């Protein structure tokens, strides 16, 4: 075999090895989760801190931990089998803004802060988020938002409905 033939054979062998390695590597790469079908039918929960100070960020997470289980419990109690849809969750949020505000304000006051709290339901631009195998692309979602104080701090997002 001449020199040119040996080079061609070596190149072919290296290409076959490279393709085999790529195929093997591909089997170890997890598949991307399926995107959520659409932004309707989803109610997000958004808490915005007063500032980026450590205390305000801790307070934001405390408000989340105090209020979210109450909201989830109340929404779940209104759902019955086939009637479980986002309209019920949105209606609950819209009709209970004052109640949700009182819960958040109680927590803020109990922690020794004098910040005001506002609550609203509206459409918000929300960044992409992965929850286990469910992917929510960036976009506009209906959200229940609690803003603490000036609302100039980092925020926190989750999904209220559908329950994850």
Predicted regions: what is each one?
Residues 85-128:
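Amphipathic, coiled-coil-like alpha-helical scaffolding segments used for oligomerization/assembly
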Residues 42-48, 116-120, 143-147, 157-159:
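Soluble periplasmic/extracytoplasmic beta-strand elements of cell-envelope proteins
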Residues 1-7:
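Short, Lys/Arg-rich N-terminal segment immediately upstream of the first membrane anchor
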Residues 134-164:
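Soluble extracytoplasmic domains of inner/organellar membrane proteins
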Residues 9-26:
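Hydrophobic membrane-insertion alpha-helices, especially the h-region
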Residues 41-97:
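Early exported N-terminus immediately downstream of N-terminal targeting peptides
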Residues 26-38:
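Aromatic-capped interface at the extracytoplasmic side
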Residues 48-52, 122-124, 149-151, 161-164:
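Solvent-exposed coil/turn segments that connect beta secondary-structure elements
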